[in-house]
Amino acid sequence: MAAADRPFLSGIILAAGASTRMGRPKQLLPLGDRCLLQHVLDAAVASRLDEIVLVLGVQAKEVREAIRLPDERSIRVVVNPDYAQGQSSSLRLGLRSASPQSVAAGILLGDQPRITRQLIDRMAEAFLAAGSAIVRPLYAGASGRAVPGHPVFLARRIWLAAEQLEGDEGARVLMSAHPEWVTEIPVDGEPPGDIDTQGDYERAVDTVRGETIRASGQIEPGRR
């Protein structure tokens, strides 16, 4: 919960999409011991974010029933009836649903289960230190070429501009139009990639399975 002596930060999880490339609601896909969206939600709940706005859309009732919401955190679930109009409609609803106390919103994608509490906290602290309108991570990437990603923090003073975005335009449009607004924070490793296709999902399942096996001290199949 919010501490009296620190700025209030909101987190907005965009999880309303129709998953057209996947062909089924990816929010509900099992990944380890939880559904895919629960991984993102759990990381946000564990972070220093003071509230979480979870934006649902397609099959909102089924998704809401599949996730666990802890009682001790301020979590607001909102349903975007216009999710077919693209991600911008969910971003707009999320910003408008955030607390009036909030000085910024950290934007997370509901199909990035590799996001971590540590990364969210690092970006939150970087935002507060930078004083910029936008702060985003810049991942090193396996190829050595820097790759921008999420979570992206947007200062309240540019929310009105973000609410004018249309279709599937995300904050990247604002960053392209106003590079002077942006501070990029170098982060080691690969970005927490989206789960857009069956192949993406299968790779995520394999990764989680391998982590579970290693954590238990067992030997992975095929390794001796």
Regions found by a protein language model. Give the residues of each.
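Conserved alpha/beta core of the MobA/IspD/sugar-nucleotide pyrophosphorylase nucleotidyltransferase superfamily
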Residues: 2-8, 160-224
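Nucleotide and nucleotide-moiety/phosphate-recognizing core
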Residues: 3-148, 161, 180-188, 209
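Short glycine- and hydrophobic/aromatic-rich loop-to-beta-strand nucleating segment
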Residues: 150-154, 193-195
